[in-house]
């Protein structure tokens, strides 16, 4: 069992790794994420664009599930948003949704899977 001093040290360590410049990410948003890819001794940024269908808030372990459809095949990836591999996060557009998880989009195809845009 952790004593209070150890727990405070762990909390301070977590706070040092949390990114503070992240945009407000909500379910249904279309994001463009820049992911750092290391190939040999070269490093580049690869962009991944898709819709946020799930979000799990857990301080430093906060994850988002992003879904995109590529050549008719749905692809989902889970990203740790505070990871050093995530170089950038840009919100392309906001959508009006009434669910906390959009897993039902997995069963929809084409125009049926579109979400209404929300203007802010």
UniProtKB/Swiss-Prot annotation:
Belongs to the bacterial ribosomal protein bL19 family. NCBIfam families: rplS_bact (TIGR01024). One of its GO terms (biological process) is translation. This is Large ribosomal subunit protein bL19c. It is found in: Plastid, Chloroplast. InterPro entries: Ribosomal_bL19, Ribosomal_bL19_CS, Ribosomal_bL19_sf, Translation_prot_SH3-like_sf. Keywords: Chloroplast, Plastid, Ribonucleoprotein, Ribosomal protein. Disulfide bonds: none annotated.
């Amino acid at each position: 069992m952790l004593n209070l001093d150890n727990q405070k040290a762990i909390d301070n360590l977590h706070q040092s790794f949390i990114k503070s410049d992240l945009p407000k990410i909500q379910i249904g948003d279309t994001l463009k994420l820049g992911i750092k890819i290391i190939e040999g001794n070269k490093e580049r940024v690869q962009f991944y664009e898709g819709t946020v269908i799930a979000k799990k808030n857990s301080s430093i372990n906060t994850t988002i599930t992003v879904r995109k459809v590529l050549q008719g095949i749905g692809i989902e990836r889970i990203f740790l948003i505070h990871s050093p591999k995530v170089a950038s996060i840009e919100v392309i557009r906001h959508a009006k949704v009434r669910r906390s998880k959009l897993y039902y989009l997995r069963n929809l195809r084409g125009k049926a899977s579109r979400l209404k845009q929300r203007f802010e």
